[in-house]
Amino acid sequence: MEVPTESKTTQIDEISHNLSFTTSNAGDSSWDKISFFRHRSRQIKRDTWLVSVFVLLQIVLFAVTMGVNDCSGNSHGHCSAKLLGRFSFQSLSENPMLGPSASTLEHMGGLSWKALTENHEIWRILTSPWLHSGLFHLFINLGSLIFVGIYMEQQFGPLRIAVIYFLSGIMGSLFAVLFVRNIPSISSGAAFFGLIGAMLSALAKNWNLYNSKISALAIIFTIFTVNFLIGFLPFIDNFANIGGFISGFLLGFVLLFKPQLRQMPPSHKGKLFEDDMNRSTRLKEQFDRPVLRIICLLVFCGILAGVLLAACWGVNLNRHCHWCRYVDCVPTKKWSCSDMTTSCEVYSSKP
């Protein structure tokens, strides 16, 4: 049977178009790479309810903490921002972050050596990640959480981000317990540092799928550095931040194994698009081999078990590392990092 001339012409045109497209794009696979920090309009449309709940919850808890602190009533007017009344802050010499007193932080569930070892209040490991030392700490921490958390939730979904956030907070608190002193400290940065670690592992794991990698590394490093420097101030535990970062980095290799691929422009769709998508999928699967996930999971479980046993045995690494206290708090003329828990002032009037 003779093939119509028009059909032959159509087939020849399609073959010529495919050959032309293949030649013009030979050796160029930039179309299947994606920017790590993509514009919001190009990201997957997902609700970010999880990060919103985290932010709202921590704002409410900070307001409750300041209400319980009641500086105007307990410190006899030695407060900052006195116009706020009950919600005014302790003096800057006591808390440079514009927040409550040390005794209030301990009362609300902050970490302290006496509470953990003598009173066996292990529940503080769960409450400490939700507290903030002051208004400055709250703004910087939640601002960073919104930037990092929304991106991570949009890319990988709320369930995996919630697991990383909670486990990193617990791991960070356990790290902090090994270095905790009598002055109370909070570990809210641990959960956030877990997201930073997970973001870094997601970038490293899918390195060949992203462009602008140096810019992404610079952004991650900047966020890490700013939040880590804040940890040198009183009541913020940098060891918790370190523990949370390690936890998030390992859990990122375990859980974040599905990066989003950018689709080709409509004019590039067809069999060639399917072939290149298969190539990208094979590349992704090369990074997603279960051996790496299993190794990272075993390392995470080993570290978690180790710090948990050390915390239960009451190990205090400050006895073996005298300079470690400066990783957690650097004393200056403006504030002190002593082991003495600061309480609200109490004055007695003489007759």
Curated annotation (Swiss-Prot):
Give GO terms for biological process. proteolysis
What keywords is this UniProt entry annotated with? Golgi apparatus, Membrane, Transmembrane, Transmembrane helix
GO cellular component: a single term: Golgi membrane
Cellular compartment(s)? Golgi apparatus membrane
Q: Has keyword Plastid?
A: no
The annotated topology with respect to the bilayer is: Multi-pass membrane protein
Q: What S-S linkages are listed for this chain?
A: none
Where mainly found? Golgi
- What InterPro entries has UniProt attached to this entry? Peptidase_S54_rhomboid-like, Peptidase_S54_rhomboid_dom, Rhomboid-like_sf
What GO MF terms are annotated? serine-type endopeptidase activity
Tissue distribution: Expressed in pollen mother cell.
Which domain of life does this protein belong to? Eukaryota
Protein family? Belongs to the peptidase S54 family.
What does this gene product do? Probable inactive rhomboid-type serine protease. Probably essential for the meiosis stage-specific callose accumulation and pollen exine formation.
Its protein name is: Inactive RHOMBOID-like protein 8
Q: Which organism is it from?
A: Arabidopsis thaliana (Mouse-ear cress)
